Amino acid sequence: MLLGSLGVAAIGVLSACGGNDSPSTSASSSSGKNSSAAGAAGSILVWTDSNREPVLRKVAEQFKSDTGVTVKLAVKDFAKIPDDFITQAPTGKGPDAAIAAHDATGRMVQNGVIAPLELGEISAYQDVAIQAFTVNGKIYGVPYATENIALVRNTTFVKDAPKTFDDMIEMGKKSGAKYPFLVGLDPKQSDPYHLYPFQASFGAPVFELKDKGFDSSKVAMGGTNGEKFASWLADQGKTKNFNLNVSQDISKDLFAKGQAAFILTGPWSLDSFTKAGIKYEISEVPSAGDRPATPFVGVQGFWMSAKTKDAVATQKFLVEYIGNPNVQTELFKVGHRPPASKQAFEKAKTDKDVAAFGAVGQKAVPMPNIPAMGSVWADWGVAQAEIISGKASSPKATWDAMVKAIDEKIKKG
C-alpha cells in the first residue's frame, strides 16, 4: 500500500506537520468507512496529468478506504488546465481540485475560480513554495514540488565550477568542447525564464524585491541597471554565446551528445544526460553582473475550486493526503523535482542532483503569479529576441520601451 501506516489517526498528526488532451477518468475502487471529517460519502473530481496519475490513483484508494469518499481522476493536458478550469468551473462542470503550476494562481484568483486553503503548519513546507501560491496574503494551493534551473557542466571537459559568466565562457573555450556554453532560446521570444539569473545579476529584477518575494505593482527592470543588461545581452548575441536558433531540445541534445562544456537547464534534462552516459556536475548559475545570479523557482501544487460542492472533502484530500510527506516522496519519484515538504525533501536530497538543484533553489525567487504575467512574458521575450538578434538598433531604447509597455499593462491590471 502506498501510504502504508497512513490511517485516519496518522493523517490527523501529519496534517500538522504536469498528459493527454482528452480527459480519461478513473475512480478509486476500494470501499471503506465514512468519516465525518470528510463529510457524507460522495465523490470529488481531481484533474491531474498523466505522469502523476498513478500515484494519485493509489492515494485516492487510501482516501476512499479512510473516508468513504470516492476521488475521481481526470487526466488532462497540464498546459491546458488553467484555461479549461476558468471555462468550466463557473458552469459546475469543472473539477473540485486540479494539479497546477503556481504562476497561474493570480489569474485564477482574479477569475474567482479557486479558493484559499488552510494548510495548518505551513512551516512544514519550503518557504518559497508557500510564497509561490500566496496571493493577497492567502494561500491558494497545496505545493508538492519545486523546480529551478542551474548550471550543468560536462566534467570530462571542465572539472571546476565557474564563478562568473566570463570565467565560464573562457573555461568552455579552453575545454575543447565544440560549444563552450548552451542555453535553449526561441527565435521570436528568446527565453526570459532561462536568462533571468543573468538579468538579476545586473540588479534589474522583474519587480521590486521584498522580504517575501516580489512587489508586482512595481516594475524594476528598467533604469541604468536594466540598460546595462540590455547592452550585455546584445554583446552575447554578437559573440554567439546566445544563439536564438538553438532551442531547448537542440541544446539538450547537443549536451547529451557530449558536444558542450556547459548548459543552463533544469532537472527535466538530466535523464537524457544520464542515459547518454554524460558525466556531469550541477552548480550555481555564474553571475554576469556584480550581484548574484538568482534564478526563478517554479512550484507545482494543487488548487481547490471555489465552486466545489464538497469543500470539506476536497480540502482534506489536498491538505492531509497530497500534503503528506510520504505522498510527496512518491510524487518526487515520478517527477524528480525536489519536494515542497521539508520532510520529504530531506529524504530526497540524498540524491546528489536533487541536493544540488535544491541548494540553488534555496536562493531563487518564485516566478511572479500576477494575472498580467502572460503579457509580461510576451513583451519581455520579444525585446530580448530583438536585442540578441541585432534587429534592435538601440538595445537600450528597445529595453526601455519594453519596460514602459509592461508597466502600463501592470497598472491596468
Identify the meaning behind each predicted range.
Residues H102-I149, D160, F165-I169, A177, ...:
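Hinge/lid segment of periplasmic solute-binding proteins
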Residues Y140-Y144, I149, I169-K218, A260:
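Extracytoplasmic/periplasmic solute-binding protein
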Residues K76-D84, D103, D167, N243-A256:
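Short helix-initiation/N-cap motifs at beta->coil->alpha
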Residues F214-L244:
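Glycine-centered hinge/linker elements that transmit conformational signals in sensory
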Residues S283, L331-E386, K411:
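Long, aromatic- and glycine/proline-rich binding clefts that accommodate carbohydrate-like moieties
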Residues I139, T274-V334, S393, K411-K412:
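Extracytoplasmic/periplasmic substrate-recognition and gating elements
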Residues L2-T105, G289, A313, A397, ...:
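Conserved N-terminal structural module of periplasmic/extracytoplasmic solute-binding proteins
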Residues Q88, P95-D96, I122-R153, P180, ...:
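A structural signal for short loop-to-beta-strand junctions that line the ligand-binding cleft
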